[in-house]
C-alpha cells in the first residue's frame, strides 16, 4: 500500500528517509509552505542527520528521489488534498495541526484509507511499537504513533512493570530543541517559558508522554506522570524515570531484564548499553529507546532511577513506518 505525507517538516522529511531505507513506498507529499525546488533542497541537506546519500531532484512537477517519483501537492486544507490521484492510501499526518480523529478524518475526502498521526492525540488510539501493536484492528481509521518520548519511555516501563511491578513513578525528559521553540526570546502566549531563547536556556516544560504510557499499557494508567526540560542541543533526548517498585530487586536484576528484552521481544525497539555514552552517540540511532546501564541509580530494593536515550527525530520516524507496515499486514489479512 502506498504512503502519503502531509507536512514536510523535521518528521515528514525523516519519515521519507526512513521509508526509503525500509523499503516502504511514499507516493505523495503535501505542504502548502514549501515549493518543489525548496523541497529538494530541504530533503537533501540536513544539519543534524547529514546530506541525503541518494539522488534528489525536481522533475515535471514531482519530487524524484533515487528515481522514484513522488507527487507534490501544496494544499492548505487536508480535505482538499487529492491523495487518490497519486494512489496514496496510508497518510502520515505530520503537520502537528490535525491531531484529533475529526481533524485527521478530513484526509478521507481526497481518497485516504488510513491516517497515522505523528504526534499524541486526544482521542485517536495510540500505538507504540513493541508495546501494544496487537491492539490494532482494521476498523481503526485514524491512529496515533504517540510521541517520541512515549516511544522511549513505554518499552522501559513495560520491562520494569512485567518484571518488578511499577507502583508509581515520575519521569523527566531532558529534551533537545524542536521547531516550536524560539531562537531568541519571542512571543509564546500559551507557554511563556517556551518563548524564551532556546539556545541560551534550560526551559522547564510540560509533557503528556508519561501519562500517555497509561494509554498504551493500561495497567500503568494513573501511575506515571512527568515533565520536561528543553535544553540547547539540536537532537537526541534522554528519559530519566524514577520508580517505586512492588517487587524487591537489585540494580543488576534490572540490567539483566533490560538486556534480555533488548535481545529478545523488544529487539530493534529497545537497546542496551554499558558504554560511557553521551547524547551525540545516538544521532541516527533507529531504536526507540536505549537503556543506559551505567547511568541508572538505586536507593533501595524498591526505589530506582533508570535512564534511557532516544534520537527523538530519527528513531521516531522509523517507528511511523513500522506502524504503517503492521497496519498494512493486519488490513490485508
Curated annotation (Swiss-Prot):
The keyword NADP does not apply. Pathway: Carbohydrate degradation; glycolysis; pyruvate from D-glyceraldehyde 3-phosphate: step 1/5. Keywords: Acetylation, Cytoplasm, Glycolysis, NAD, Oxidoreductase. It is found in: Cytoplasm. It is an enzyme of class 1 (oxidoreductase). Its EC number is 1.2.1.12. GO terms for molecular function: glyceraldehyde-3-phosphate dehydrogenase (NAD+) (phosphorylating) activity; NAD binding; NADP binding. Pfam families: Gp_dh_C, Gp_dh_N. SUPFAM superfamilies: Glyceraldehyde-3-phosphate dehydrogenase-like, C-terminal domain, NAD(P)-binding Rossmann-fold domains. GO terms for cellular component: cytosol. Its main location: cytoplasm. The active site is at 148 (nucleophile). Signal peptide: none annotated. The keyword DNA damage does not apply. D-glyceraldehyde 3-phosphate binds at residues 147-149, 178, 207-208, 230. The modification N-acetylserine is found at residue 1. The record marks 175 as: Activates thiol group during catalysis. It comes from the Eukaryota. One of its GO terms (biological process) is glycolytic process. NAD(+) binds at residues 10-11, 31, 76, 312. Homotetramer. Belongs to the glyceraldehyde-3-phosphate dehydrogenase family. This is Glyceraldehyde-3-phosphate dehydrogenase. It comes from Panulirus versicolor (Painted spiny lobster).
Amino acid at each position: 500500500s502506498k504512503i502519503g505525507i502531509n507536512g514536510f517538516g523535521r518528521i515528514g522529511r525523516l519519515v521519507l528517509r526512513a521509508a526509503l531505507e525500509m523499503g516502504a513506498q511514499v507516493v505523495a507529499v503535501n505542504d502548502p509552505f514549501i515549493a518543489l525546488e525548496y523541497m529538494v533542497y530541504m530533503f537533501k541537506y540536513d544539519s543534524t542527520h547529514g546530506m541525503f546519500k541518494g539522488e534528489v531532484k525536481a522533475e515535471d512537477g514531482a519530487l524524484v528521489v533515487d528515481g522514484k517519483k513522488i507527487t507534490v501537492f501544496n494544499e492548505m486544507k487536508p480535505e482538499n488534498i487529492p491523495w487518490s490521484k497519486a494512489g496514496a492510501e496510508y497518510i502520515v499526518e505530520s503537520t502537528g495541526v490535525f491531531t484529533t480523529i475529526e481533524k485527521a478524518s478530513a484526509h478521507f475526502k481526497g481518497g485516504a484509507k488510513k491516517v497515522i498521526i505523528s504526534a499524541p492525540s486526544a482521542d485517536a488510539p495510540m500505538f507504540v511499537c513493541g508495546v501494544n501493536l496487537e491492539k490494532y484492528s482494521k476498523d481503526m481509521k485514524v491512529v496515533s504513533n504517540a510521541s517520541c518520548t512515549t516511544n522511549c519511555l513505554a518499552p522501559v516501563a513495560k520491562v520494569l512493570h512485567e518484571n518488578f511491578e511499577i507502583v508509581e513513578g515520575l519521569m523527566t525528559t531532558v529534551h533537545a530543541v524542536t521547531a516550536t521553540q524560539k531562537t531568541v526570546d519571542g512571543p509564546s502566549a500559551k507557554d511563556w517559558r517556551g518563548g524564551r531563547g532556546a539556545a541560551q536556556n534550560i526551559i522547564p516544560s510540560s509533557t503528556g508522554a508519561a501519562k500517555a504510557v497509561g494509554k498504551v499499557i493500561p495497567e500503568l494508567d494513573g501511575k506515571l506522570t512527568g515533565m520536561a526540560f528543553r535544553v540547547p542541543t539540536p537532537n537526541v533526548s534522554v528519559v530519566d524515570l524514577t520508580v517505586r517498585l512492588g517487587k524487591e530487586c537489585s540494580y543488576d536484576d534490572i540490567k539483566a531484564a533490560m538486556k534480555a528484552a533488548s535481545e529478545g521481544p523488544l529487539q530493534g525497539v529497545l537497546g542496551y548499553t554499558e558504554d560511557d555514552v553521551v547524547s551525540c552517540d545516538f544521532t541516527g540511532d533507529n531504536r526507540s529507546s536505549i537503556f543506559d546501564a551505567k547511568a541508572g541509580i538505586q536507593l533501595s530494593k524498591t526505589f530506582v532511577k533508570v535512564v534511557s536515550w532516544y534520537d527523538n527525530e530519527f528513531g521516531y520516524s522509523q517507528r511511523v513506518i513500522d506502524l504503517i507496515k503492521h497496519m498494512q499486514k493486519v488490513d490485508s489479512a
